[in-house]
Design a protein with these regions (language model features):
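N-terminal secretory signal peptides
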Residues: 1-15, 22-31
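N-terminal lobe/hinge region of extracytoplasmic solute-binding protein
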Residues: 59-111, 142, 213-214
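Gly/Pro-rich hinge or "lid" segments in bacterial periplasmic/extracellular proteins
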Residues: 93-94, 98, 188-243, 247, ...
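Long beta-strand-rich cores associated with HINT superfamily self-processing modules
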Residues: 516-542
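Extracytoplasmic/peripheral linker and loop segments enriched in polar/acidic and small residues
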Residues: 407-412, 416-418, 447-520
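Structural transition elements
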Residues: 335, 339-372, 389-392, 484
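Extracellular/periplasmic solute-recognition and catalytic clefts
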Residues: 154, 163-166, 221-232, 249-308, ...
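Surface-exposed binding/hinge segments that line
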Residues: 119, 155-199, 222
Length: 542
């Protein structure tokens, strides 16, 4: 089994490459990366001795060959790495998502204001030694807000942020379209990048391919796609999250067995690993490791091609959800570390409300809906990503659909293969994949706009955006974004999620917990995340 990228929305990172004419560039490192690289390094290096100067080795269960462009990426590995390399004006705590001053000197006193002014941290430098200026801030936000440039970050900002103005070399002003307090925590998604580097011809292609020059506590020293990425503490960093490790070596090991082996035993080759298989928790704990989970928006979802009959019929989509034995899936595949979806949002989300349509296992209702829709003799090929826990869940889906008379074929494939087909607009019936918008934040408005919207990439995949119900939904989503009253906004969100649940075009089957393992004798300050990747900005040697 292979874990290519746990967060399939992450997976669609490659889809954005087509907008820059760089599809496929993420598989190779640009030659210009050598300017900030130290050359090949053994993936087996663990520091060459003890002491505080030894290398921290981490095992990441996702590929490092996705887009590294902070304005585009949703790759688990790359986003986690970028959080150590780059800074936003503000950044957020990885668990609570409380904002703190990063490149800016303070958090705005009034989140409800329609202008936010920021002063840049004095003496802040990029990893090439050049100073961070207001021009760099404007450069990044201009890209994000450019109507002619399609980026993932655009969906997080364009609805509420009008423009970003330079006041002088050290000061900028953000002008909002309307009061939007949630925007404060979203500023971490706009990582400030050096204009003098990435405005050059081919600069964004280089960023996609792995070139990373930020102002954060760690400098990227080497990048080997599908192998490892290395870092070292940046000596000129003068911000609030100073590096505790002199060097770091992050290995990408997408196969579950070798990933577990690398962190196991007395001679383990790593101190921390994410994406721990549920079946290995006891083994690792027995070996003295701490294994902890984070529950959030991680989910297995089904996505239907609404232009492929009979999946244009909402009754068919609902029937397929009702048919799935989620209890068995959670018991057998997830070893109890999951819950059936009772809303698009997970139960712990502050905006959660049980949806009006909840797809409890009901094969009789599923059969009745198919009969009502006039569907019989249905044959379905499930196009799935081969993330290991998704692969573990697929047999339950097949058995459940077979049980109501559907001839079901499983077709798990490399993530890139699945979403290349989506980008090429190839025909398909249903996709089973994984998603976790908590990588970007916790607020429901962000989560829902990540998955739904008139220009949203997922909606292009579903071929549903021009549906009259979809158009009404998108208007309600925009109304919620603009609603200044928090409780009214919450109600609007909950009401439109009822529509999302009823239509089941792209909808979760289960929400599941993610597991991280580390050696508590060597590391302290680790907190398990409810989304893929790791954050070591507050960790240190024990």
């Amino acid at each position: 089994m292979r874990d290519v990228t746990h967060d399939v929305p992450a997976l669609h990172r490659r889809s954005f490459l087509k907008y820059t004419g760089a599809l496929g560039a993420a598989a190779a490192v640009s030659a210009s990366l050598s300017a900030c690289s130290s050359g090949p390094q053994s993936t087996n290096e663990t520091g060459g001795g003890g002491g505080r100067n030894r290398t921290l080795t981490a095992v990441i269960g996702y590929g490092n060959d996705g887009s590294w462009d902070p304005t585009q990426t949703a790759s688990a590995f790359c986003m986690a790495a970028n959080n150590h390399i780059y800074e936003g004006l503000l950044d957020t705590d990885p668990i609570s998502r409380e904002p703190y001053a990063a490149l800016a000197t303070q958090v705005p006193a009034d989140p409800s204001a329609t202008t936010w002014k920021f002063t840049l941290r004095a003496g802040a430098k990029f990893h090439d030694g050049k100073p961070v200026t207001a021009d760099d801030v404007v450069f990044v936000f201009d890209r994000i807000l450019d109507p002619k440039t399609q980026t993932l970050a655009k969906g997080f900002f364009a609805s509420w942020l009008k423009e970003v103005r330079k006041i002088d070399a050290q000061n900028v002003e953000l002008v909002l379209k309307f009061p939007f307090p949630d925007g404060i925590s979203r500023l971490t998604l706009a990582k400030i990048m050096p204009k003098h580097v990435f405005s050059q011809p081919g600069g964004w292609e280089d960023a996609i391919a792995g070139k990373a020059i930020g102002s954060g506590p760690y400098r990227q020293t080497a990048h080997h796609p599908k192998s490892n990425t290395t870092f070292e503490a940046y000596p000129d960093y003068n911000g609030p999250r100073r590096a505790a490790f002199k060097k770091m070596n992050w290995l990408t090991i997408v196969d579950a067995a070798p990933r577990v082996a690398r962190i196991s035993g007395a001679s383990a080759g790593a101190q921390i690993a994410d994406n721990i298989p549920y079946a290995n928790i006891g083994q690792l704990e027995g070996g003295g490791l701490t294994v902890a989970g984070g529950a959030g928006m991680n989910n297995l979802f089904l996505m239907f091609n609404t232009k492929h009959k009979p999946f244009d019929d909402v009754r068919v989509r609902q029937a397929l959800h009702y048919a799935i034995d989620t209890g068995k899936m959670i018991e057998v595949a997830l070893k109890g570390h999951g819950k059936p979806a009772s809303s698009f949002l997970n139960e712990a989300n502050p905006s959660y409300r049980r949806a009006k349509s909840v797809y409890d296992h009901d094969p009789d209702k599923a059969k009745a809906l198919l009969k009502e829709a006039g569907v019989s003799g249905l044959k379905i090929e499930i196009l799935a990503v081969n993330v290991s826990w998704i692969v573990d869940c697929l047999p339950t889906i097949k058995a459940s659909w077979d049980a109501i008379g559907i001839k079901t074929t499983l077709s798990p494939q490399e993530t890139t293969a699945v979403f290349t087909k989506m980008d090429q607009k190839q025909d398909y019936q249903v996709v089973a994949a994984a998603s976790n918008p908590n990588q970007f934040g916790l607020d429901a408005d962000l989560i829902m706009h990540y998955n739904y919207g008139p220009e949203n990439l997922w909606m292009q995949y579903t071929r549903w955006a021009d549906n009259s119900i979809a158009k009404a939904l998108f208007k309600d989503m925009d109304r919620a974004t603009r609603e200044p009253d928090a409780e009214k906004k919450k109600t609007i969100v909950q009401d439109y999620i009822d529509v999302v649940a009823e239509q089941a075009v792209l909808y979760p089957v289960v929400h599941n917990e993610l597991m991280t393992a580390w050696n508590p004798q060597q590391l302290t300050g680790i907190r398990a995340q409810p989304y893929p990747g790791i954050n070591l900005l507050q960790a240190k040697w024990a």
